[in-house]
Amino acid sequence: MILKQIKELKTFLYTPKRVVIVGHRNPDGDAMGATLGLFHYLKKKGHQPTVVVPNEYPKFLHWLPGSKKTFRFDWQNSQSQKAINKSDIIFLLDFNALHRVGHDMQSTLEKYQNDFALIDHHQEPDEFAYMYSDTEMCSTCQMIYHFIEKMGDIHLLDSDIASCLYTGIMTDTGSFRFRSTTSLTHKVIAHLIDNGAENHRIHSNVYDSSSFGRLQLLGQALNNLKVLPEYKTAYITLTEDEKEANNFVKGDTEGIVNYALSVEGVVLAAIFIEDKEQQIIKISFRSKGTFSVNKFARKHFNGGGHDNASGGKSDLSMDETLIKFCDLLEDNKEQLIHSYDS
């Protein structure tokens, strides 16, 4: 976001406004942390903010301050539509294009007459009236911190804002272990802790609250793990039947793909999850070094994200998707073999 846009937005938000804050479909820790962090900040500034998420988010994020005040577009449609239609501006957080909210909500947003403000760290964003896009940032939550800073309001940080932003940074950096984590990230984290983010409690709420069913599902996933050493690749599959047998709920597959990436010598990991409701195979990719799963997902699986973490989908069956994936591994063999951690 350039200085001119900051000044324009500061002027626009100088008086109380009705603001809607939107995260992407299937919200993760960064999306929920960013939307709720911005919600608390705008509320302290005297605005009337409303968070609208497209659908359900994981149970391990329900503790976040303000989460009970969010609207779900999929089953609180009338309230969501009313908030959107009455708003003076809509903030789009942690996604780069309107289709990332799902078809129904996208149709509503495309009819919106006022301005959008985008804050996001994914590649190739669409154009909106106000843009704060930085693909070098580890998370949208860190960008919300810097946005508050740019607005001259860093002194307004409190425990609610700090806890939300800490959560998103922690989850999107794999607990600060990914290459996107910088010294600046740690400085931001330190400031959030100084302003009330209880790091031990947040970590426990997110990572130490697994249901028995989730652990059983993890066991099933690890049992399905396949390693292809000739391609430095590992992948996991989960069918709808396997999910149902282990009492699957949204969020149970979060982070499982990282187990495949943790195998010694692996530079590309994937998880393929059957979703009968959407009639697709949902895919998460992770990589090490120079192999860009963002380009790979964009080109072959109608997805994208970051160079070392991205998502995609397939309209083929599980078996057909795996055949396609393995054929692509052969096509990308040289790149995979020579990928390295720089």
Question: Which residues fall in each region the model found?
Answer:
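Acidic-glycine-rich active-site phosphate/pyrophosphate-binding loop
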Residues: 8-15, 111-126
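Glycine-rich phosphate-binding loops that contact phosphosugars or nucleotide phosphates
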Residues: 89-105, 117, 124
